[in-house]
Amino acid sequence: MKIRIAVAIAAGLAALVAAPQAAQAMPHDHHDGIRYASVKGCTVKGEQRPCGEWRLMMHSGEKGSLPDAETIAREANGKSSHTQVAPIAVSGNGRRVAYFTKSGRLAVRTMGGGVKVFAKDALPRVAQYDVTFQLSDDGGRLATVFATNKAVKTRIFDTATGALLGSTPGGQTLLGFSADGGELLTEVSADESVTDLIAYSESGEQLYRATPPQIVAANSPSALAADGRTTANVVMGGAKSQLVLYDMQSDQIIAKRKVKLPAGDLNMIDWTGDQQVTLHLVQYPDGKANKMTIVQIDTETGAVKVRDHYSLLKDSYVFAACGG
Amino acid sequence: MRYTSAAAALLASAVIGGLGITPPAAHAQAGPSQVRAAWIKTCTDKKNDTTYPCGHWQLITRDGGKLTVKDASTTEIDGKGRRLDDAGLFAISGDGRVIAYERAGDHRIVVRQAAGGPVKVLAASLVPKRYGTSPLSLHLSPQGDRLLVDSTDEKERVPTKVVTIATGKIVELPAKDSMNGFSTDGGEVLAQRFNRDNTLTLIAYRTDGTSVRRTPSQVVANSAMTALAADGKTVAVIISGDEEAKKVPRLRIYDLETGDLSAGVDLALKAGQTPYLAQWSADGRLTVLVQTGDEGSTAVVREFTVDTETGAATQTDKYSISKTRYAFRVAGE
């Protein structure tokens, strides 16, 4: 789940908390989950900055908020950065959201459930705008990535207990969790001017490292399947778009599927089933609200099905959509 | 490439003959007739603090001498004939014996012996009327018998042209390809194509119109440069060094026909010495050029012969180019 500076969203957590959803049998029952989180922007003393609370836009159309969440990032010393947006992430299934509380603690809130506030020292003391969160599809795992000048290890947490499960090397780009949350995929610049993909277990053990073919490396990002070794990436090319499946263990392209995609730039790619990859496609029409289209691709056939589409709140300054 | 033996001198004569232009007898031997590089001076417009090329193209000869190419255009022109602030087209063959350039006055492309003598004026059609010489670049084959006229016009309208100088025959190559250079014997042109799926394909075009192509692995696609051997399939792949990571440049050998890629060797150069030109010699050795000196300081060019098995590098030449340069071109570039 990535924060995209450009657009935004808002949602009402309070509303969510008030109306817990009973039916949770389906892992991808998006109807009671968050579509995206958004914060408004305004101009203060000539500078653009986030204003107001994080808004949570739900699949049901309801709108909640996250009153306990920080929207303006704090510096490492705890002072406000005034203009930078604090990080936020929504799990793939839209049921959990990770953020910094107003008191500067890391928190993961479950829709219709409670909030897990992490230990004070869960994260190193760095500026909040140098921190990125990524939740697994079910929100059970959280990765915290640090974009500080000095490489700091990425930390992986169990969001139910707050326990630190492991860490992966800093200085790499975290692409995301595998479909079941058991592994992570990173991308790193390696020797000889190439880009490598690395799969780690949630405890930080390196499982596979590969220098993929051009068609994978040149069409980033890739997403990791539940098996922890198969990646998917998309070549965005209008009518010539294709889904590429790659096996990190054997260093082989497994399949290329022609896919017919609706308009939009690739915002996110995630595995959401053993034979399903979900894409978030975003459009930025001039003067209008940004549009998101979410499609599910059958990895066996290349068939594309639109799962959801919506217009983002027009006053969004920054938004974070659910991944799955 | 240097010709030191009698046989080589004969070969040189043959090449000159092949060029179809009459060399002045006094310059038909090795020595002052070979040039290492050409450069053109920079001037500053004090009003808006911009620089532009000025004066004449100067040749730096193998024996350290200087020659002026008075009829070479200082600048390029656009489609309306207006002079631009880019240096005029210029190229030197790999052996340093032949030069090609944009002629002052009519901006036609001409070729002649580096040492002097009459020019051979090439077809007017080599310069697209729509763009002038501005999108073009010239590359001479190692022996100076063929000229590549590459175009980087944004709309990819202008095909690359390969001119056989003795006959004037022109072969067109796809406009969307970018040209890496000739093979050692001038028999093929190595090109690369950026595909719609964001990958890069290497293509060797042969004179008979056929080609060999392959989409290589990342390490080849992301390399600093490639050079095609006389066999038309063996590619030297130079991988950039990384000063920050203290990694020296590396060499791998890629076979364009089979896709085989060697494990590679570290080159016995410094991390900051990534070669900017590589050429196979006729006897299968690899020559690389390393340049130091940024704009405004003296450029130093070092030539090394590289052992492709071990990466050992032996310096075989070194020369400098004035800090007052606006642009320079080395032999074989």
Regions found by a protein language model. Give the residues of each.
Chain B
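Short coil/turn segments at the loop-to-beta-strand junctions that recur within blades
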Residues: T74-I77, L84-A87, A124-G132, I170, ...
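Beta-propeller blade-edge and WD-like acidic-aromatic loop motif
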Residues: D49-T75, A104-P128, D145-P174, G187-V189, ...
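Extracytoplasmic low-complexity, Pro/Thr/Ser/Ala/Gly-rich segments
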Residues: A28-G94, Y319-E333
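Short secondary-structure capping micro-motifs at structural edges
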Residues: A221-M225, V237-G241
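Secretory targeting and sorting signals
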Residues: M1-A30
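Blade-terminus and WD-like Trp-Asp/Gly-His loop motifs, strongest in beta-propeller folds
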Residues: Q29-V35, L89-V98, E102-R103, S137-R146, ...
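Hydrophobic/aromatic beta-strand elements that line small-molecule binding cavities or substrate pockets
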Residues: P135-L138, F304
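Post-signal peptide N-terminal segment of secreted/secretory-pathway proteins
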Residues: G79-G116
